[in-house]
A protein has these predicted regions:
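Non-catalytic DNA-recognition/assembly elements of restriction-modification systems
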Residues: 1-19, 24-40, 131-171
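DNA target-recognition domains and sequence-specific DNA-contacting regions of bacterial/archaeal
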Residues: 10-125
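IQ-motif-like calmodulin-binding regions
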Residues: 128
Length: 171
């Protein structure tokens, strides 16, 4: 597979979250994505607000200034210093998103003294698979599905081994 470098902003719509004071957030159902590397970046669940600073995205990759990166197929609001990334002209699915999340994690691991500004992210390049000079999202999807299938076989294999081991212990 051939790979080529692409400027992040040539491939993704990059938007940022904004600070909402904690006292303005009320417990609710919409996940709030922060810079944490725990729980898929979710810091809590809150009611939607009608404020220009309240930014909501759906079906996107979150990328924080600390380099945390997750896929969110659901509607979520973004905290300050969290970016949303959506491919231009392509709708993410779980497989392509997982491929891209891992690429972003590898590409930005330890870069910029572990802090990545909006400016740095937008000027950055990411190496993506291409076919006929076009980004190959189909390859990304098949690649992750192949890994998933191999993992299922391994899980089945280990389950069979565990059953056989228990049977031997009973004898």
């Amino acid at each position: 597979m051939e790979y080529r470098n692409f400027k992040v902003t040539d491939v993704f719509i990059v938007e940022t979250g904004a600070n909402i004071p904690q006292n303005e957030l009320e417990s609710g159902k919409t996940p709030r994505i922060s810079v944490t590397n725990l729980n898929n970046g979710i810091s809590g669940y809150y009611n939607d607000l009608s404020s220009n600073n309240y930014r909501v995205q759906e079906n996107f990759i979150s990328f924080s200034f600390l380099g945390t990166c997750f896929y969110h197929p659901y509607k979520a609001s973004l905290d300050m210093k969290v970016h949303s990334l959506k491919p231009i002209g392509y709708m993410l699915n779980k497989y392509t998103a997982l491929f891209l999340v891992n690429l972003f994690k590898k590409s930005f691991n330890g870069v910029y003294n572990d802090q990545i500004s909006s400016t740095d992210l937008k000027k950055s390049y990411i190496r993506l698979p291409v076919t006929n000079d076009m980004i190959d999202f189909d390859f990304m999807e098949k690649y992750i599905k192949n890994i998933e299938a191999k993992m299922q076989k391994l899980i089945l294999y280990h389950s069979v081994l565990a059953i056989r081991e228990r049977e031997r212990e009973r004898e």
